[in-house]
Structure formats: structure tokens, C-alpha cells
Amino acid sequence: GEQKYLICNADEGDPGAFMNRSLIESDPHAVLEGMLIAGYAIGASKGIVYIRAEYPLAIDRLKRAIGQMREYGLLGKNILGSDFSFEIKIKEGAGAFVCGEETALIGSIEGKRGMPKSRPPFPAISGLFQSPTIINNVETLGTLPNILRNGPDWYTRFGKEGNRGTKTFSLVGKIRRPGLIEVQLGTTLREIIFDIGGGVQKNFKAIQTGGPSGGCLSEEFLDLTVDYESLASAGSIMGSGGLIVMDEDTCIVDLAKYFLDFTQKESCGKCVPCRVGTRHILEILERITNGEGQPDDLLALRTLGDTIKKGALCGLGQTAPNPVLTTLRYFRNEYLEHIKDHRCRATVCKPLIEYRVIKEKCTGCQSCVRVCPTGAITGPRSEPHNLDASKCIKCRSCYEVCRYEAIAGDAIVIRTAERQS
């Protein structure tokens, strides 16, 4: 019959996300057995695990597990005496974020540059080497053996109407207990952050869901349930399952700039909306964080973001503006503070801050003197120190080590830089 392929997408490239890698490293057989089941279901005879080369331990364990399956007759010709034959190979990717998109991933396996293609035809009709191809991620395939073993009724006990089952998340950021978690779909963000993650040490500010192209949600969404429709209604996405928690020390504008810088660099450059649009958004964000923003920039950001979402070729471009659009929607005041007041409330944007020692609070412990890389802080022990602003590179080292700032509040404080005429 017609050659069919099954591909396991293990190209996990979100910053701070490590769900797929951990599953493969800890239980590669669950994923491979899921591929075997899926291959049998669709009539495929060849399976490929596409995984980035930066995961050497996961790759090693996959190879060992594949070898063990062959030893037990679970791979190869006529598996267990049946007429079903199936082989699994590993394809190591070069780490391009865009290759997580299915058509770009297929191009990479074929030895081409990883660039998305317009659809239709969809991979299920014409995919790898123009043959019918089904692509699933690690978590989906790893769940199949348990569903078959326990039955669909067991699986649908978890979750909520329309979103059954569980989801693995990577919970990172300013959280007391970071790590991998598995929760039922429909669990609230409040339960995830405060009950499971232990909350944050300082005041909670926001949570980023869905990785670099996800949305940034404010405190008002803590009781939002984590499911596909609810996140989409708030302007975010589920994505691969990355959750980044932020506190009051996070600058929302700088955060949006960080994620746009990532997606702009990872863009394949094929379509104009993504290639040019993300660059223009990044340039505007850089101006704002440098204290050179204009009131019209906010409208420009929204217009560009909406245009990119509508015109980009693939999911990377269509979701790239999400961090900007959601922060504009829920944290507009921080943008206005950067533009109108030349103030960064989180004291992150260097051109908008200025360090100084408060003499009344300084005990002369010299902690700041020892960590200052430029010698900008001087003074004898047990006496208030001096800070030479001309030497200060605003690295925050002094601010971070000052015990008295942390306890009393402002042994070393940051004030808004004077607006230049």
C-alpha cells in the first residue's frame, strides 16, 4: 500500500520549557509505545522522532529504548508474528524554533531549510516525501499506552467538558517551587501558582502562558481555568505548556521586548508580516525601554500586532505579537510610565534608572563595594559609601546584595533619571 509516516515532534524550543525532554529522559518507552500504537492505527510503517541535538541524554535513552524494543520483537518486520511492520528512527534537529511547526519540521527531515509552507495540502495528505504523514507531540503519544490500558472512560474522568485529560506544564520564574507539574485541564491559575507552586516571595504581577508567543496575564486572571478556550479568550495560548511567573521586579515592557527579540531572531524570514513586522515591533519596544518612546507608539504596536496575526504564514508569526498585545491590554499603564514619565517601576530598563546610596541607611558593610565591577562605589568600612554615577554601569549588583535594602526597603534605591531636554 501507500507509504505513510508517523512523526513524533520532540522539537521543544520554548525558553524555560522542558516537559518533552523530561518525559523522554525518564520514560522513553511510553513515547515509543505510543508511536507503535499510532503507527498501527493509521497504517504507517515508518516512524521518526524529531528531536533537537541539544538533548544528548534524551537522544541516548531513545536509542537504548529503541534497541530494547528490537530485542523484544516490538520493532521491525512482522511484529510479534503479525503482518504489521514498523521502524523508528531518530532525526536530530539543529535547534531552530520554527522547526516546531509541522511543515518546517518536515522540510528539515527532508534535508531542506526549515521553512513553513502554505496549506493545503496538509501533511495528512501530502507530507514527508509527499506521502501521508501524521505528526503528534511527545505528550500525546506518551499518553496513548495508558489510555488503551485503562480505557477512554478512565481518561475522560479528568479535565472539564470539552477539555478532557491532563496537561504537563513547566512552572518556572519567580515561583517558590518551580518544576514540572501535571494537572487536570480546567485547573485555575491560582491553584497552579499558589497551591502547587507555593506562591511568590514578593507581590505577584503576571504569568506568561504558552511560551515566547503566548500571552501575559495579570492578577485579574488568577481564577481563569487553564484550558484551550479560556486562554484563547484572554488573548493567550496553551502552547507547549510553559508557565512563567513574574513578580513586581519584572518590567512588563522589557519582558515583551525579550520575547519579541526571541521570535524575531527565530523567524525563518519567508513571509513579510513576520520578517518585517516583528522587526518593527522590536524597534519600537527598544525605543520605549531606552526612554525614547512616543505616545503614538502604542497605536503602532497594536496595529502592527494585529496585521502580523492576520497575515503571517505560520503559527510562529501568527502568535508572535501575543506578548505585546496582551501586555498592552492588561499593563498599559507601564507602557505609559515608560513613555510619558520616563520611569521603569521595576527598575530594569537601564536608561530610565539611576542608582544612589542613601547615607542614612548605609552601614558601610562594603558588600556593594566588593561586587561592583567598575569600582563605582567607594568608602571606608562602617561609614556611608559613595557612588560615582559616571562609573556606574547599572548592573544591579549593588542593589541585589545590599542586605539593608532587602530588609528595610531602601538602603540603595533607584530613582527615575532626569528627562533630557
Residue spans for each PLM region:
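Iron-sulfur-cluster electron-transfer modules
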Residues: 1-113, 359, 390, 421
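Short pre-active-site segment immediately N-terminal to redox-active cysteine/selenocysteine motifs
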Residues: 267-270, 361, 391, 401
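Hydrophobic alpha-helical positions that pack around
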Residues: 2, 59-185, 197-199
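Gly-rich Lys/Arg/Thr-decorated short loops/hinges at beta-loop-alpha junctions or inter-strand turns
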Residues: 8-20, 123-128, 170-175, 379
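Terminal amphipathic helices with adjacent charged low-complexity linkers/tails
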Residues: 46-66, 86-88, 200-233, 329, ...
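Ferredoxin-type iron-sulfur electron-transfer modules in oxidoreductases and energy-metabolism complexes
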Residues: 2, 10, 19-24, 46-47, ...
